[in-house]
Amino acid sequence: MRIVHFMKKENSGLARCCLELAKYEERLGHKVVMKEPSNDMAFYGTEGDGADIEVIHSQLPPEHYFNQLPKAMVQHGEPLSSVGNGVSMKAICDLANRVDFFLCFRREEWPIWSMIKRTYQVPKGIDLEVYKPLDGITEKLPGEPAILYYENMRGQRNPLYLLVAMQEVYKRFPKARLYIYNMNDKKMQDTFTTFSRACKLWACGVVGFEGPVNDVNLLLNRADIVVSCLYPLYARSIEAFGAGKPLICPGYREPGYEFTCDLDPASIADAIIRAWEKYDRFDARAWACERHDVAETVRQCVEIFERYAR
């Protein structure tokens, strides 16, 4: 089967997800091409004639609107943000009558997307060959526990509630330390630097605010616990499980997961404390292999594609 993906060539979680899908589609023996929607040019795989199915991750070139090829649209973002940014939900609805079906990754969002179009839900996976425990990590981040926040920050996606939660974590574990990475926006950095000084956050284990790193898996391996403040869903922070680290995230509600919490500083603090107290009893890597293997995500996607492929 020849699968053509349309996605913006950029450095983002969405792009990493798409590249993982392509890698494992090829492993199943399929030909994969990834194209930039703005110019319809391939930047991954080999240009060729036609496709058996086209998969939209952000936009679709207008010249493909009426080519009669089967089409899927993958819903990477969560519905509330798609409405909140003033653009995405309208674009999704406008394209809905050009596609055969939607794909989503989390059962909580299925009822919303399925109102617009027939929607299939597949498990959200990560590349477990990339996100994995590393032997011989000697430069662990100081702290017991060393807590990491590395999610891309924008708008309401930020670590404010985690910073507040650190007061309670620090009372329980005075050696606890919080590290904030991947802060790219200068206004966001200025805001949190000022907030940190005003609240004297250094006194409750907040170490500082750093920019992005090249090796995310190495950073994950240097930490003990990873925290995301996303709600009501979750995103790429499940990479933590692949690296063998527990994840604290208000939007992560997988059945059977011990360390769930609400979007509330006290609840986040409680989940961090529980995760550290039970640290040696939870196998995060095994959880990732069971629940978040992108190879299984792709296997299920391909089964669906084959029902519609030309």
Describe these PLM feature segments.
Residues 13, 262-263, 276-310:
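A charged, aromatic-enriched C-terminal amphipathic alpha-helix characteristic of glycosyltransferases
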Residues 36-38, 177-193:
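Glycosyltransferase donor-sugar binding loop
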Residues 83-84, 125-140:
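Acidic anion/phosphate-binding donor-loop and adjacent secondary structure
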Residues 93-121, 126-130:
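A short, active-site helix/loop in glycosyltransferases that binds the activated sugar's phosphate group
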Residues 139-157, 163-166, 179:
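Conserved donor-binding/catalytic core segment of Leloir-type glycosyltransferases
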Residues 192-211:
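Nucleotide-activated donor-binding/catalytic signature segment of Leloir-type glycosyltransferases, i.e.
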Residues 221-232, 245-246:
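Acidic donor-binding loop of glycosyltransferase active sites
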